[in-house]
Amino acid sequence: MAPTIRKSHPLLKIINGSFIDLPSPANISAWWNFGSLLGVCLIAQIATGLFLAMHHTADTSLAFSSIAHICRDVNNGWLLRNLHANGASFFFICIYFHIGRGLYYGSYLYKETWNIGVILLFLVMATAFVGYVLPWGQMSFWGATVITNLLSAAPYIGPDLVQWIWGGFSVDNATLTRFFTFHFILPFIIAAASMINLLFLHQTGSSNPTGLNSNLDKVSFHPYFSYKDLLGFVIMLGALASLSTFAPNLLGDPDNFTPANPLVTPPHIKPEWYFLFAYAILRSIPNKLGGVLALLLSIMILFLMPIIHTSKLRSLMFRPIAKTFFWALIANTAILTWIGGQPVEDPFITIGQIASGLYFLIFVLLIPSLGLLENKLLKI
């Protein structure tokens, strides 16, 4: 009998092995949907971004008015712009759920997949940051100024590094042009890195909620999980469409409706909501270099997860003590997000410092020590 084309064709058999006949654990829950949802987010962002780039002008004198032009004069431009801006928020919601799932169920023990994932997080954060500068509103300009200025904390090369990034002595036309370039190219780098992420994942297969070996109980990805993922797509795209049409500016900053003005500083400079937890950690340290290092470490600490895993059990499903502290970490991150949006005054400064300390304490001290404690309890 002639082999099926999807199994014999050089290109189709790669797709078949990744999305059709892929053996998947039968017991994976909806928490495993977020990987494919991230793929949908990326495709949606590239599609809407491509059309927006056709009408956007990366020039300080025209950028702000080109956004107004897109919203007023371009066919469905308002929808494209709102889908793209809110799509970024949904992208980060999916990323944070995806990372949370990985931490809870021990997915980080697939080291290569996890490390590529953390690199992807950095790339997505960089893309979102440079993209936020493009409308050239007040918060775009001052956000770019504040965040790029952090590089000046680097010893010896700091000031030169900042001027090199700026392309001059301040955030100006050269900065906007290069940020547009970065914002255009980075999503394609993210797409390539996502494929590497999938490649590594398919070497080992997916983990599952129990953290046990699931080779005895696997089903094909299609039709079971393709339809399960499809439900996730409908829910997410429905929520994105609803937010983009009914409350498109809910997550934005009102300051960004004012054109960038280097002579007027906004009363509270803050990034988009998805960066607030890291921004709170940055602000909680009075020293500039210390703050920058803490900011970097708040994400880079994820690289340590495979090293600090001391438990004999993979998943938190059977680890009641560690489970409690996982949710404490989630609550703590939520508190940091809230603090990041507050002005720098008491009691917010103190709360931010305590929450930042706890954030690192849970990762560096509690996760490894609780693993060892639970190992001892298993022997009793």
Curated annotation (Swiss-Prot):
Q: Name a biological process GO annotation.
A: mitochondrial electron transport, ubiquinol to cytochrome c
Report the InterPro entries cross-referenced here.
Cyt_b/b6_C, Cyt_b/b6_C_sf, Cyt_b/b6_N, Cytb/b6-like_sf, Cytochrome_b, Cytochrome_b_C_euk/bac, Cytochrome_b_N_euk/bac, Di-haem_cyt_TM
Keyword Mitochondrion part of the UniProt annotation: yes
Q: How is the cofactor bound?
A: Binds 2 heme b groups non-covalently.
What cofactor does this one take? heme b
- Output the SUPFAM superfamilies linked to this UniProt entry: a domain/subunit of cytochrome bc1 complex (Ubiquinol-cytochrome c reductase), Transmembrane di-heme cytochromes
Q: Where are the transmembrane segments?
A: 34-54, 78-99, 114-134, 179-199, 227-247, 289-309, 321-341, 348-368
PROSITE patterns attached to this UniProt entry? CYTB_CTER (PS51003), CYTB_NTER (PS51002)
Q: Where does heme b b562 bind?
A: H84, H183
Q: Does the keyword Heme apply?
A: yes
The places in or outside the cell where this protein is found are: Mitochondrion inner membrane
Q: Which domain of life is it from?
A: Eukaryota
Question: What is the membrane topology noted in the UniProt record heading this document?
Answer: Multi-pass membrane protein
Q: What does this protein do?
A: Component of the ubiquinol-cytochrome c reductase complex (complex III or cytochrome b-c1 complex) that is part of the mitochondrial respiratory chain. The b-c1 complex mediates electron transfer from ubiquinol to cytochrome c. Contributes to the generation of a proton gradient across the mitochondrial membrane that is then used for ATP synthesis.
The subunit field of the Swiss-Prot or TrEMBL record says: The cytochrome bc1 complex contains 3 respiratory subunits (MT-CYB, CYC1 and UQCRFS1), 2 core proteins (UQCRC1 and UQCRC2) and probably 6 low-molecular weight proteins.
Q: Anything else of interest in the record?
A: Heme 1 (or BL or b562) is low-potential and absorbs at about 562 nm, and heme 2 (or BH or b566) is high-potential and absorbs at about 566 nm.
User: Which family would the database say this protein is a member of?
Assistant: Belongs to the cytochrome b family.
Q: What is this protein called?
A: Cytochrome b
| Species lineage | Eukaryota, Metazoa, Chordata, Craniata, Vertebrata
